[in-house]
Amino acid sequence: MMKKAFITGITGQDGSFLAELLLKKKYDVYGLIRWKTMNNFENVEKIMDQITFVEGDLGDQISLNKAVKKIQPDEVYNLGALSFVGTSWTQPIQMSEVTGLGALRLIEAVKDNAPNSKFYQASSSEVFGNTKNAPQDENTPFRPVSPYAIAKVFGYWMTVNYRESYGMFACNGILFNHESERRGLEFVTRKITDGVARIKFGLSKEIRIGNLDARRDWGYAPEYVEGMWMMMQQKKADDFVLGTGETHSVKEFIIEAFAQAGIDDWQKYIVIDKSFMRPAEVPHLVANPSKAEKVLGWKAKTKFKELVKIMLENDMKRIQAISKK
């Protein structure tokens, strides 16, 4: 029998990479898509015909019950969320509904309709927020500073609660920033590689950035979805931090991207724009992924410069094609 996996957020960066991985592993893949909205299928274009799409919404319990009951999945991956931290201050209620309560609705649907199914909750390094401890591991206290992070903390503890209360296989992956050529253009890394490519081909003169000094632990997304899958293959459900253990600033990312594009006077293209500053900034996130290494045998492979290269080359190709039109 083929294993069945049900993925929320399947059209996003992580969902699409996870779907590809599971298809390679001969899973039957089901993906939740929202009705009545414009779903962007760009990331799953090449595998559309191999996925069964199910309509539903993390804001609607009945649709989730129906989906889980019908599919009877072996594994459920909750990657669906409003994932851009910046907008969480302007839409805190919607953020909490989808990212926080959405996780609860889905695990509740699993408990009631497919209790033997394994459940993965996509947590985030943002839960550590304004932490005093570095690096951060599974025992670091949470100090969330954005509505997004607070919603993720709620989802995290609900997952732990269902594991402990009902004996469900439910695990949290606390993933540090992971990027790729499929990252949304609103995210700073992709904004930089897209912007550098536009400048290189004469389509733009500037990149507007908020905080140059924010430091993050950036890895390559396809490796992280493999980590998710590994967590779900364990005998016992547990929570894991995934990250590279290295930290770089936004400024370093900018310098590296411009250097790789062969532009040395990067300063003249960067405009500091206060509107991109967050009401509360997370200063310094860096992972201690030693538990994942020891227990799962998982390790981030793609180094910082290589990550910038992958993203920049993709955007250079894309923008070059646009500039020729």
What are these regions (language model features)?
Residues L18, K24, G31-L32, G56-G59, ...:
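C-terminal substrate-binding subdomain of Rossmann-fold SDR/epimerase-dehydratase oxidoreductases
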